Regions:
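Buried hydrophobic packing segments
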Residues: 23-30, 162-165, 249
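Non-catalytic, well-ordered alpha-helical scaffold segments
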Residues: 92-96, 133-136, 156-159, 243-247, ...
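Conserved nucleotide- and phosphate/pyrophosphate-binding catalytic cores
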Residues: 163-364
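Internal, conserved structured core segments that host functional sites
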Residues: 113-115, 119-169, 173, 194-197
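N-terminal Rossmann-like or analogous alpha/beta NTP/dinucleotide-binding catalytic cores
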Residues: 2-139, 257, 296-298, 306
């Protein structure tokens, strides 16, 4: 069986460091590993419309932002197939068929759905498209026969429900769909990067993000205003590492080489943490180090983005070609699904032959 990856993002804004450590960086590594036969990267505009139906222009304008972020991070259209979800109509048809295999109560029990409903204040009035997201996500995954889906830990319940739908379909209609495996970030600090304000999640809507396309000045300003330990008032005071955003970001981004380059007084992050805990180390010094670490990571991303920004028609051509290739794959899967469900009437020559013989006998 071919090893195939499917992953993607909603085009509701520019991508940020949470996306980078949660999935983007790993995607590039997987792309360049040579371990996978195909990699599909989806710009999930149709899914974004489930809670932005009254603001399609927001989604429309952010297609290019996400594409630029993808390319600037190192996703290579020669190795990874980047496509736009809404331009693959087979996904909608697959979703429609899968809906018959899922109960409303099962959707209501999905922890990710419940959390997202609360976060978006949908408790009183949930859009059906948003509520059925686990089903449409299953269509996305199975259309491309994905064996591996790299996501953050918050998406685990969604992947488990996708696996349930696949098993249900195969038990009813015969082995047709591929059951995907989840691939979580291997750095535990990357599982969910907090916002710069200390909130549990970096979120575009909360305004607590450091964007991949931020200027050096913007990054520095955001780092220097980061939430730390509110009780660490004086330099000599002992400080807390737990819940301290600056150290969480250092867990995710810093390397021993960074210490040698930017903070040679310490050999590694453990030494820095120990000094902070016992007191005598100020937040400003730690933040300046984090700023240097992030600028080093983001500078090559910024440079690549600026190059792609010079040829926007070329970026759209990358998306057009990727979408055309994705269309062909999804069309083949849809044919297999319809054959398994016995609704491929015009392609079933045997059905037509048998019924022709049946009724020719009656007419005689």
């Amino acid at each position: 069986m071919s090893k195939i990856i499917l992953t993607g993002d909603r085009p509701t804004g520019r991508l940020h460091l949470g996306h980078y450590v949660g999935s983007l960086k790993r995607r590039v590594e997987l792309q360049n590993s040579g371990e996978f036969d195909k990699i599909f990267i989806m710009i999930a505009d149709a899914q974004a419309l489930t809670d932005n139906a009254d603001n399609p222009e927001k989604v429309r304008q952010n297609i290019i932002e996400v594409a630029l972020d993808y390319l600037s991070c190192g996703l290579n259209p020669e190795k990874s197939n980047i496509f736009i979800q809404s331009q693959i109509p087979q996904l909608t048809e697959l979703t429609f068929y899968y809906m018959n295999l899922v109960t409303v109560s099962r959707l209501q029990r999905n922890p990710t759905v419940k959390n997202e409903i609360i976060m978006r204040n949908f408790e009183a009035s949930i859009p059906v498209g948003f509520f059925t997201y686990p089903i449409s996500q299953t269509a996305d995954i199975t259309a491309f026969k994905a064996t591996t889906v790299p996501v953050g830990e918050d998406q685990e319940p969604m992947l488990e429900q996708a696996r349930e739908i696949v098993r249900k379909f195969n038990s009813v209609y015969g082995d047709t769909l591929v059951e995907p495996d989840i691939l979580l970030p291997d750095n535990k600090a990357c599982l969910r990067l907090p916002g710069t304000d200390g909130k549990a999640k970096m979120s575009k809507s909360l305004g607590n993000c450091i964007y991949l396309s931020d200027t050096p000045e913007e990054v520095k300003r955001k780092v220097m205003s980061m939430y730390t330990d509110p009780d660490h008032i004086r330099i000599e005071d002992p400080g807390k590492i737990e819940g301290n955003c600056v150290f969480t970001y250092l867990d995710a981004f810093s390397t021993p080489e960074d210490f040698a380059e930017f903070l040679p007084d310490y050999n590694n992050l453990d030494e820095l943490k120990e000094h902070y805990r016992r007191g005598g180390l100020g937040d400003v010094k730690v933040k300046k180090f984090l700023n240097n670490v992030l600028q080093k990571q983001l500078e090559p991303i910024r440079k690549r983005r600026h190059e792609y920004e010079k040829d926007i028609p070329g970026v759209y051509e990358i998306l057009r070609k990727g979408t055309a290739a994705a269309y062909e794959v999804a069309e083949q899967t849809l044919k297999e699904v319809k054959a398994a469900m016995k609704i491929n009437y015009f392609d079933d020559a045997e059905l037509i032959k048998v019924q022709s013989e049946k009724y020719s006998g009656i007419s005689d």
